[in-house]
Amino acid sequence: MRATIITAIIFFISLTGYTQAPTKVLNFKGRLFEISLKNNAEKILKTGTVKVFQDKSLCVFIEATHFGVYDFLLPLGHRYTLEFSGENMVSKKIEIDARRCPENLEKTAVDFDVVLFAKAAEIQFNSLNAPIAKYTWDPRIGILLNDDDYSFDQTKALKKEVRKAKKAITLAEK
């Protein structure tokens, strides 16, 4: 009887400790949009997906809601690549390095609204083979910080490719 009570107490204490432990996660959330290369009209992407690669291995696959919303949790201590895509759309990637996030960080929200566009015939968007943005933990200010120089260069290359795609679309319509 005494052994049963002790076992029950140990089980209860370990269960209580487990449920009250800090989550130590990043909460990724946002919306997916699509933009027309013809007229720049923007609307919610209704069939979008998010693939999450943890240390280069696929760990999460999420379909956005019909409002383009996605929301998921990822543990700290890893490098992630988030790949946003949709049917007949180009894919965009964002790299998150959460390896240096502090152990006492319990939960933090990371908001990304991502705009995708339809694939254009015979136009290669080579700039999208690499992540469009890279984030890493900055201990000085206590947040995930974007590498602005990298993002500027990637955005510049993508804008150049988008201009070519728009010209090709305009020529094809004539």
Residue ranges and their predicted role:
Residues 16-27, 33-34, 127:
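Beta-strand-rich domain onsets/edges
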Residues 4-15:
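Sec-dependent N-terminal signal peptides
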Residues 83-99:
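A short, solvent-exposed loop/turn motif at the edges and junctions
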Residues 71-81, 87:
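Short Pro-Gly-centered beta-turn/loop motif in secreted/extracellular proteins
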Residues 99-139, 145:
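Extracellular beta-sheet/turn segments enriched in Thr/Pro/Gly and aliphatic residues
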Residues 28, 37-54, 136-143:
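Short, ordered, surface-exposed loop/turn motifs in non-cytosolic proteins
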Residues 131-174:
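Conserved, compact domain cores that house catalytic/ligand-binding motifs in diverse enzymes
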Residues 56-69:
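Short, acidic Ser/Thr/Gly-rich low-complexity loop/linker segments typical of extracellular
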